[in-house]
Regions:
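Glycine-rich beta-strand-to-loop/alpha-helix junction loops that act as flexible
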Residues: 57-60
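Anion-coordinating catalytic cores for phosphoryl-, nucleotidyl-, and glycosidic chemistry
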Residues: 72
Length: 269
């Protein structure tokens, strides 16, 4: 992907995508911009060899590797039980250099994990601003997280090119990504054990359950395994049946309001 020669003007590209999509894309400009930044970050990570110990997971992996129509925000990876931060040394500067290379008017800040951070997850927080951006508008912020947990069904595959009209996105990004069945397991566990309603996870669960290549029984088995990986066996045992009571959530105004930020209007009916 090209840099400061002006061929990766992500804001202009996103505006063109939204305009071409018609009225149904009107609310999606921020997440379209973010998706173009996802491509840029993943391309840089691949070129610098950071994928060797990581497996892509989460909502963005569904969108970029498995064809979900729902836009997403952050980048999530499984690093394995023996994950070592030293394997990602230089990741922050890799991301910063790549995003800064989009143009002289782009400012990038990458907040790296604390060296003494404990727990299962390490998080990089990436903030991007352009010179012409109104000061009252927030920076584009993307969280990149690596969890010290295993992936049980990794698949080696390319990221999808969602916008073939832009040559800057034509480079092939290849990485390991969890299977749709394993991602469903993650979503089941997250939805059941979270302290708050995770409406996007619920939408993803419904979309995954409709696919012919997803084994729902296997997903429940994996969710139980993963509850141990995350230290949430007790919560999972107590709340696994929470996923059965989703009809009221799906029919709520709050669910519709949240999903409007991530889905084209044609999928909201």
């Amino acid at each position: 992907m090209t840099g400061a020669d002006g061929t990766y003007d992500y804001k202009a590209m996103a505006a063109g995508i939204v305009l071409a999509g018609g009225e149904g894309m009107g609310n999606l400009l921020p997440v379209v911009e973010k998706e173009l930044l996802h491509y840029r970050i993943l391309d840089a990570m691949m070129r610098e060899g950071f994928f060797s110990s990581l497996v892509f997971q989460g909502g963005t992996s569904l969108r970029l590797c498995h064809g979900s129509p729902r836009y997403s925000e952050d980048l999530d990876f499984a690093g394995g039980t023996s994950f070592d931060m030293d394997t990602l040394k230089g990741l922050g500067s890799c991301i910063s250099d790549s995003l800064s290379g989009m143009g002289d008017d782009v400012t990038v800040r990458v907040k790296e994990p604390r060296p003494d951070a404990d727990g299962l997850t390490r998080r990089w927080r990436i903030a991007i601003r352009t010179a012409g951006q109104r000061k009252d508008l927030p920076s584009q912020t993307i969280k990149l997280e690596v969890a010290s947990i295993p992936a049980y069904e990794p698949q080696h595959r390319p990221a999808l090119v969602n916008y073939p009209m832009f040559p800057a996105l034509s480079g092939q990004i290849i990485l390991d990504v969890e299977s749709p069945t394993e991602i469903l397991a993650d979503k089941l566990l997250s939805y059941a054990c979270a302290s708050h309603l995770r409406r996007r996870d619920l939408w993803d669960m419904c979309w995954l359950a409709s696919r012919g290549d997803v084994d729902s029984r296997r997903a429940m088995e994996l969710a139980e395994l993963k509850s141990s990986d995350y230290g949430e066996e007790g919560l999972w045992a107590d709340r696994a049946d929470r996923v059965a009571g989703v009809a009221d959530v799906i029919g709520s105004d709050a669910f519709a309001d949240e999903m409007r930020r991530f889905l084209p209007a044609g999928l909201m009916t």
